[in-house]
Amino acid sequence: MEKLVIATRRSQLALWQSEYVKSRLLEHYPNMQIELQEFVTKGDKILDVPLAKIGGKGLFTKELEVAMLEGSAHLAVHSLKDVPTQFEDGLMLAAVTKRFDPRDAFLSNKYTSLEELPKGAIVGTTSLRRRMALKILRPDIELKDLRGNINTRIAKLNAGEYDAIILAATGIQKLGIENEVKYFSPISTDIMIPSMGQATLGIETTNDPKVLEILKVLNDNNAHIESTVERSFVDTLQGGCQVPIGVKATILDENSIRVQAIVGMPDGSEYISEDITADIEDYETIGQNLAQIFIDQGAKELLEKAEKVAFK
């Protein structure tokens, strides 16, 4: 193929990620012409309503998928955490890139950490998963919705609307804006378990064999194993991108993999959590088996309850 078109969202972070993928491809195919085709997704347009209340899956991927199915783009670059576990007919996950920093991060101009926040402090986040974790850790703080791109969210913090905000560490690090706030502190996954696929890029495409062959060079085996476990866990629970589920698989060595997972209510009042170590050779079934342990403890009923609360 002489020309490859990458569908991407228009945000600064999405463009960084697509340029990163473009540069990786050019390392292997220096003579290939690669273009970016920019889109504004439904999730980008609706900034005054928490994502959980919008509902549905693929809020940040649908428009890019349409472009691929219609033939105007060959692939799309997504934050893997935004990619639903089930694909439209004719589409598939072709590769997952090397994982960046998977942790969430604490940002503040007043306090160095979650522990230092005073009672009643206002913390900005819209993610139901982060809300759940924060309320489990600090039931005495106040949570306030936070939408917009990374720069908008930091601007709101700097304007004094929040005492602290929680964002994905990788986005801040990719854009090199850690110093735009006084305190930037990644949070251990032992305290706040990330979303499935967090800090990994998912490369989606059609089943065109020529394109699939080209995209093989982007796949990172460790990220593939970890994200397979995480996505299988969420898929078995039938949880979308906007419900309070955290899951993080971490390869420990050539034989074993650790999986941390949590499911619960957005207010932290009820939750189920597990932290297991399994044989890495079973990575294709670990997520499903762990999800079944959660289901046996009432996870599906808990998620249904959480969804009703979130969509009110």
Curated annotation (Swiss-Prot):
Entry keyword set: Porphyrin biosynthesis, Transferase
One Pfam family of this chain: Porphobil_deamC
Cofactor note: Binds 1 dipyrromethane group covalently.
CDD domains: PBP2_EcHMBS_like
Keyword Cell membrane part of the UniProt annotation: no
Biological process annotations from GO: protoporphyrinogen IX biosynthetic process
GO cellular-component term (any): cytoplasm
Cofactor field: dipyrromethane
S-(dipyrrolylmethanemethyl)cysteine modifications at: 241
Superkingdom of the organism of origin: Bacteria
Gene3D superfamilies documented for this protein: Periplasmic binding protein-like II, Porphobilinogen deaminase, C-terminal domain
Family: Belongs to the HMBS family.
Record's function text: Tetrapolymerization of the monopyrrole PBG into the hydroxymethylbilane pre-uroporphyrinogen in several discrete steps.
PANTHER family: PORPHOBILINOGEN DEAMINASE
Subunit-structure text: Monomer.
Record protein name field: Porphobilinogen deaminase
Gene that this sequence comes from: hemC
